[in-house]
Amino acid sequence: MADYYRHMPHFHPEGAYLFVTWRLHGSLPPPVPDVIYATPGHRFAAEDRALAHAGGPRWLEDTRVARRIVEVLRTGERENLYELCAWVIMPNHVHILILPSSDPRKITHWVKGRSARESNSLLGRTGWQQESYDHFVRSRKEYDRIVRYIEENPVAAGFVTAAEGWPFSSASGTS
């Protein structure tokens, strides 16, 4: 198991599916009381709800940027860094569910670094928040719940009425 701490703990048991979320730098104003005071098990849900309605940068809604991130995610799978199980690109954050083939820290660094370089070249900006959220999947039931969560994220945020209608998601059926 690979464990490490930055601002949050990260636990990566070998052979476990991994749910990872990245958000744009400045996408949540400091502090967000619902996030800060949420119990550890509910912190992610509170932050994700706040992201859906945050007034910060929304550079990922630029289709050129979203396409680049999708290309990076698919390249990582083609290069056997991971199996990409589910994903969604939201206006200010990204959710993925992967089965890592290598160190998850290296995967996170590679995906965020490559997608930021390519996106920033389009926008002339900086992008990702340094910290990311990750959670290893403990059961098939949890795996299925996380896939639904990822693919239904645009519906929950009110952007579309059906998950298949969001073009930058594994639910859209585009490959």
Show the residue positions of the predicted features.
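Short catalytic/metal-binding and nucleic-acid-binding patches
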Residues: 1-175
